[in-house]
Amino acid sequence: MNKQPEDWLDDVPENIDEEDDEIIWVSKSEIKRDAEALKDLGVELVELGKNALERIPLDEDLRAAIDLAQKIKKEGRRRQLQLIGKMLRARDVEPIQTALDKLKNRHNQQVSLFHKLEALRDRLVEEGDDAIPPILALYPEADRQQLRSLVRNAQKEKAANKPPKAYRQIFQYLRDLAETAE
């Protein structure tokens, strides 16, 4: 057997613990997971529409690759998505991820606002004039007379089993009020 000379200990640096702290070992599996996450981010970007894609900070090469991937079908699309993932690995994806999260959050906020407005509309139709003051407190620019007439029409339509035209008009009016309040 080959024995190492006793002086091999002299080659070991004294601050070995400090060097270990500086070296960050990343497993191959973690690298693959990160690459897959970036590829999934690329898929999300490709599935976005043109208007949403314009709001995301992308350089020209990446934008061109995404535009091309949106046009390609089948196997070529898979390869293009892999290329987009590779391009994302070479870039700082934090601003892209932040912009994408804002787009998703905006959609969720809009859905919750619509649910809130639907509940207000249902309350207006059920309670009638008694439900108008809280809405006026919430939206001071609301027209009390218009709200009352829409509510009366919706109640008449409901009693006569007619299509809910005024019901939809109440929702549109509340949505317009919410948009102007923002």
Curated annotation (Swiss-Prot):
SUPFAM superfamilies linked: PSPTO4464-like
One Pfam family named in its UniProt record: DarP
GO MF term (any one): ribosome binding
Gene3D superfamilies assigned to the protein according to its UniProt record, in alphabetical order: PSPTO4464-like domains
Highest taxon above the source species: Bacteria
Keywords (A to Z) from UniProt: Cytoplasm, Ribosome biogenesis, RNA-binding, rRNA-binding
Main localization of the protein described in the UniProt heading: cytoplasm
Keyword match Cytoplasm: yes
Matches recorded under CDD domains: YjgA-like (cd16331)
InterPro entries with a match to the protein in the record: DarP (IPR006839), DarP_sf (IPR023153)
Cellular component terms per the entry's GO annotation: cytosol
Keyword NAD: no
Protein location: Cytoplasm
GO BP term, pick one: assembly of large subunit precursor of preribosome
Function: Member of a network of 50S ribosomal subunit biogenesis factors which assembles along the 30S-50S interface, preventing incorrect 23S rRNA structures from forming. Promotes peptidyl transferase center (PTC) maturation.
UniProt family annotation: Belongs to the DarP family.
NCBIfam families referenced in this protein's UniProt entry, alphabetically: PRK05255.1-1
Name recorded for this polypeptide: Dual-action ribosomal maturation protein DarP
Organism of origin: Serratia proteamaculans (strain 568)
Taxonomic lineage from the root: Bacteria, Pseudomonadati, Pseudomonadota, Gammaproteobacteria, Enterobacterales
Gene: darP
